[in-house]
């Protein structure tokens, strides 16, 4: 039950429709390999949540409509969130970044851009990182053709 509760929060955070700057549709299947706790430390340690993530997958669908979805293998929740953006940056073999903008004050004058998912496509094995509060997860992806 605790696992489902954590993954539901994860899904609420990630399973969103958001603007995309994509030229064509692309799909990645990503699998978590390790999870670290980074709170107040220069030396990340293995997270207690590792068993809830490792081995589980996230599918990242980026379409040209312009929308994108992130779907985990044990949950499906969709939520509108205009502060989420997926973008492609770099050279010919570009990496994909899903980031959100947090408004730090009531007036919205202080903002912070936070990377949630980063998929590196310029290496032979596609790697991704996923940030959730003080948790940093890493894994590998396959591009679905």
Question: What spans do the regions from the language model cover?
Answer:
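Positively charged n-region of N-terminal signal peptides that target proteins for export
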Residues: 1-5
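Short structural boundary motif marking the start of a folded domain
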Residues: 23-30
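Short, solvent-exposed loop/hinge segments that bridge or flank secondary-structure elements
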Residues: 31-72, 108-116
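Bacterial N-terminal signal peptides
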Residues: 7-17
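Short, exposed beta-strand-loop hairpins at the edges of beta-sheets
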Residues: 125-136
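Contiguous, well-ordered beta-strand patches that form the walls/edges
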Residues: 69-109
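Sec/Tat signal peptide C-region and signal peptidase I cleavage site
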Residues: 18-22
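Extracellular secreted precursors and ectodomains with disulfide-bonded cysteine-rich loops/domains
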Residues: 28, 139-140
């Amino acid at each position: 039950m605790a696992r489902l509760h954590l993954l539901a929060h994860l899904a609420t955070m990630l399973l969103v429709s958001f603007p995309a700057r994509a030229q064509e549709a692309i799909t990645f299947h990503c699998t978590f390999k390790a999870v670290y706790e980074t709170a107040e430390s220069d030396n990340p340690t293995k997270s207690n949540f590792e068993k809830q993530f490792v081995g589980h997958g996230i599918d990242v669908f980026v379409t040209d409509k312009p929308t994108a979805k992130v779907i985990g293998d044990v949950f499906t929740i969709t939520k509108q969130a205009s502060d989420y953006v997926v973008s492609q940056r770099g050279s010919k073999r570009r990496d994909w970044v899903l980031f959100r903008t947090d408004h730090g004050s009531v007036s919205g004058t202080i903002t912070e851009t936070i990377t949630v998912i980063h998929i590196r496509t310029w290496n032979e094995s596609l790697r991704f990182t996923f940030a959730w509060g003080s948790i940093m997860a890493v894994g590998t992806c396959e591009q679905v053709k």
